[in-house]
Amino acid sequence: VPLPAHLPKRLEHMTPYIYSKPELQRLFRSAMEYQKNRSKIHPECMKMILQLTYFLGLRLHETMSLRIRDLNQPDLYVHIRESKFYKSRIVTYNHKVGELIDTFLKWREKQGMCCVPESKLFLDKKGLDMHIDTVRGAFERIREHAGISRSDKSPFQPRLHDLRHTFAVHRLTSWYRENQDVQQLLPVLSTYLGHTHLSHTSVYLTMTDGLLGEANNRFESYIKQGKDE
């Protein structure tokens, strides 16, 4: 499936920020360190929210809407129910992510949090549902504590939602590195992300230096093979 010939223009303020791997690690550490005793949110919950949003490429409201019943640990997937465009989907994950979820669930049980199937996965220190704006506010403080900011001219700082964009770009970069046919795999990524049209995936997958580097390496390899033949 070829990429769309003409992609919609993205406004400057909507340009995603793609976190580097070291920045992701700093974010996860900062979630456990910053305002540990003052925040309404358990640091363990905040860290897991960031990790699931990135590792599974979820929208923030999808992460926040997860319930215990949506986790299928034996088969390594989560059920995203009636998300954007009122569509449900299955999002798979690997054993490493499964271990993170297992550890979190055990911690959650030790805290005495409600564990019935209908219970929200993420609860605040009072055992109540967490408000998405509270999470966004906490993320801003975590990001600042981690020392992460934009170096371009954009007036908008990196967002929590950019973790989803980062997942997609890192996935593409891995496919290029593995010499995979990205055009053939893009529909798979589009379905995984819950997009209704392939063009939606193409638009928001910002090309990073790393991704362009992988594409250039592949092109140079192709040219070299042609000369050898």
Which stretches of residues belong to each language-model region?
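Conserved catalytic core of the tyrosine transesterase superfamily
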Residues: 1-229
